[in-house]
């Protein structure tokens, strides 16, 4: 029976430990894949499938990729949902006795990527770890590429909604979850349907309290609770420990880079539901999912990769502390008014490399010589950057300046050690600077002088053989060789040993040449090995300064974002908003930040807005389609959000009382895959608003009640307005409510705080012009037929529509909608539910209830209700 070759036995032994990953198995200058991995990789990567003798009767399917360009292939597999295990040769093949030793150096997953070629500069790459138990959750979001983790604990009745909100805040590319999370269908369904991330179900054993404590202690020390802010008995410790164990399993080394742990409370940030994030197009457009056309696109004038990531996180996480917001605004205002300093600051920032991610690769030992030299060049700019920030005479900027370490010792160390012309890889040497290490200089002298020796030998051999074109060459197969053309090969001495026949001549070696080769290659190999060692020592030295460099990187990133916001404000004539803890949203000549940029060269019509929790609580906005209602409502939400990230806003004047959340319901959308119509999707989203909004929220609702009968839709729309705007019946929060139900305009004067506004329209005959101005009062018409005409409907259709409209108006005169008399409706109300039943329901723990317990509970509930009705 056929037996596997030793190498294939080694391959299968390693593969047995990594069944779920595609194994990249290093052989020489290639990463090879075999058997099923080869079949998968050849299909997904369009690689040629070949075969290799493996000791069996049939050849093993095989394909491979060059080791120097493997990252692109790994990135493509990761994007398709695969994980990749990298198996390296862990000893020098030239010195190996028998089979070369190989081992897994890391497993690449979507959330553990650190290679710059596989990451996007302008966004963090988070891996999330969630631990859900008893209606509470511990969450950890870590970016392995920057070494930062954000942790929080959620304890509330609407736990699923809260977890989803946090997932949308960080957009993880990979999610680790405990088995208990499988019971929460709302979260798992949302991840599956709406998030393009990999999901890893962790074993229950990973969460054993003893193992959790060991994992945290190994990473952060015995005082891990004080070091990280993780509560000793909180749920976050389970999430963090599971993440650390996963990183140890996949990264093998470098997990120590994950040292910066930021504990936050979700209440620190404005709540933005997934629907709101999509409707406001904060970081990607609804159509095309592109950056252009988003708020991020408008504000991103940053100069560094670190700044780009921080700006994105600010937009994703607006603040709710007026003090913290005003600190940012103070810095932006200072830079807006100091044009020269701002320009100098931005100029310096352009030369700053990505210190955050570069430090991760340094700790992992994968930073290249060219990247490390770029770090020194960045350090060269830091003193000037500090000075520019200090010169602005702004306390907030001075505070940032103080956090920037000039890193002069690191700069000097790198400049002394690394050659300015260092290549991107260590493979061929040339990395260590002249004068840094005497042995390097000595070995180079041998190598360089050998070139002269070879030239002298070549000249002598030409004379001895009479062959003027004889030359000495080198390749990795034969080493050094003598090449003689066919015209002169008859003159070659017998002492020459033929090694290869070419069409144009012959290649030989001699004893003298082999001895010289041994000296040359020995020096070269020792030189390469020494440069490897010295460069690794340099990386360890730099890695030991992790905290200093990370603190500096964070300060530089924030300086970059503030300078970018100031630049945008100056270029676009933005104003500084007044931000406080009032309930005011007062905007004079507000503009939509994105539409205004898209319409560059055209006039954007500004509009005023006054909203508060008093007399201007709910603005009912009427007017025709295409007139600008949605743009107006979105611009107000965006202005409030911009103010709360610390940005100036597109307005002449602006006063924003901090809002704790923005909720939007804009536009029609079906969810056919879930069997939901436009109306069902709309009602689900409205229900989320009504359940989660507070009196400090800003609510934007557009065309509530479509997709059902007119009376049903109108009734729902009215009930929603009453619930949101009337504090005695519901929320009493600031609301913008656009509607085609003109009957709702009669609510002004009936419900306190409701005001009518409409989009001004100019009509000439059957033609209309949208003036884009918001004015007081209800619209006098919906202009639906005129809009249809603008859309290109045939004239015969619009003329017939006018005839039908006149007939309908004549037969169905408009009736005013009166305020509902709830007292009169009480006779139709359902009987009151007994209080003891309410108490039983409130005490019920649905999460732990078994099916049989649920049936028994319902039976008892029915008995109680029947007894109550009979009494």
Predicted regions and their residues:
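Conserved phosphate-binding elements of NTP-dependent enzyme cores
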Residues: 1-2, 9-13, 20, 539, ...
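Charged catalytic and DNA/RNA-contacting regions of genome-maintenance
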Residues: 1-334, 350, 354-363, 367-459, ...
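ATPase nucleotide-binding head domains, primarily ABC-like/P-loop NTPase cores
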Residues: 35-38, 233, 288, 303-304, ...
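Active-site phosphate-binding and catalytic loops of NTP-dependent enzymes
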Residues: 87, 110-119, 254, 390-396, ...
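Charged, surface-exposed helical/loop "interaction arms" that form contiguous linear patches used
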Residues: 364, 368, 378-381, 399, ...
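Extended, charged helical/alpha-beta scaffold domains that provide interaction surfaces
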Residues: 455, 462-486
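Terminal-proximal interaction/regulatory segments of ATP-powered molecular machines
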Residues: 475, 842-871
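Extended, charged coiled-coil "arm/hinge" scaffolds of SMC/Rad50-like chromosome-maintenance ATPases
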Residues: 502, 506-540
